[in-house]
Regions:
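Conserved phosphate-binding/catalytic region of the ribokinase-like
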Residues: 3-167
Length: 167
């Protein structure tokens, strides 16, 4: 049996590589970097407070909960039907959460949920789900994939159902 020389790109991303990528991207003035990683979940890194002072449409109401954060949410388990539109759905779930004034933990879980709902649907359009319906599914204990990585310097936040990088 030969090794897979072309693994899916999401499997190539290790936590240290993501941190390095995030440092570079945030260095360009980006306020929030969201990286969808398939079954490995979804990664969020946000800029320090001074970058947030510059504002930006839709971001005015975000408080210091959004400053200088590194979060990683697991992918929710679904029976997959296709991945078309899953990334777009995840971004839409994230942005909808921001517009509703959600904290980063909620926005990240909603991004993972919206992407998962799209993957389990027959088409990208039928995977579009109401925000309240997705949140209720998360609250009911939607099962997630275990992360097959060692996250050194990250802590599992039990009440939130995600990992946060230690300061």
């Amino acid at each position: 049996m030969s090794a897979d020389v072309n693994p899916p790109i999401a499997e190539a991303f290790e936590p240290d590589l993501l941190d390095s990528l995030a440092d570079t991207v945030l260095g360009y003035g980006v306020k929030a970097l969201l990286v969808k990683l398939g079954q490995r979940g979804i990664y969020l890194r946000t800029a320090a407070g001074e970058v947030w002072q510059k504002g930006g449409r839709g971001l005015e109401g975000l408080d210091d909960h959004w400053h200088d954060r590194a979060l990683w949410a697991p992918a929710y388990r679904v029976v997959p039907n296709g991945t078309t539109g899953a990334g777009d759905a995840a971004i839409a779930g994230f942005l909808a959460s921001i517009l509703q004034g959600a904290v980063p933990e909620t926005a990240l879980k909603m991004a993972a949920a919206a992407g998962a709902a799209c993957v389990e649907a027959e088409t990208a359009i039928t995977g579009l789900t109401d925000w309240d319906e997705l949140w209720a599914r998360i609250q009911r204990g939607w099962d997630s994939h275990p992360l097959d990585l060692q996250l050194y310097g990250w802590d599992w936040v039990e009440g939130q159902g995600l990992w946060e990088k230690s300061a």
